[in-house]
């Protein structure tokens, strides 16, 4: 029996875990390590930012969802990976040994690389569920005093689709 650890509980990590379970059956152990207890369906973030969906309607309890498929879950994040020992150390102190490691951590938002960019600067983001919720709040304030809007993505952005979708529905 192989032990597989999937690091990341977003679209990539959850999809990888489900595909592994379907392909390998239940003879192998699969554990997903994510950051937090909820799986957020990121493609719905533009809808949250415009008020078409509530954040609660676009996320699931990750442990519950994975358990139905016989997949273990730990939501305390990864502190470090010891490749020599084949171990994943979580932020909560749990150590998972593995035969195979799948890394699906997704993007790291780098708002600090451009002065003034990001939710704490002069722009809004829909990259995460909390960002989309904040964008909705800022959109409501904008409606009270409307003016020009610029929607786009900065250099190096890995995905322009959400910005285009948000522009089309706005």
Feature locations, PLM:
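FAD-binding core/adjacent interface of flavoenzyme oxidoreductases
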Residues: 70-167
């Amino acid at each position: 029996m192989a032990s597989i650890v999937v690091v990341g509980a977003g679209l990539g990590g959850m999809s990888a875990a489900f595909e592994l379970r379907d392909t390998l059956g239940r003879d192998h152990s699969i554990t997903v390590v994510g950051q937090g207890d909820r799986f957020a369906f990121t493609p719905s973030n533009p809808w949250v930012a415009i008020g078409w969906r509530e954040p609660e309607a676009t996320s699931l309890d990750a442990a519950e969802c994975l358990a139905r498929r016989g997949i273990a879950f730990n939501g305390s994040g990864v502190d470090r990976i010891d490749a020599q020992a084949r171990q994943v150390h979580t932020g909560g102190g749990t150590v998972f040994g593995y035969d195979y490691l799948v890394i699906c951590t997704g993007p790291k938002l780098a708002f600090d690389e451009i002065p003034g960019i990001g939710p704490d600067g002069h722009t809004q983001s829909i990259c995460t569920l909390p960002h989309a919720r904040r964008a909705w709040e800022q959109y409501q304030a904008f409606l009270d005093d409307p003016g020009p809007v610029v929607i786009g993505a900065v250099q190096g952005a890995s995905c322009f689709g959400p910005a285009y979708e948000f522009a089309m529905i706005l």
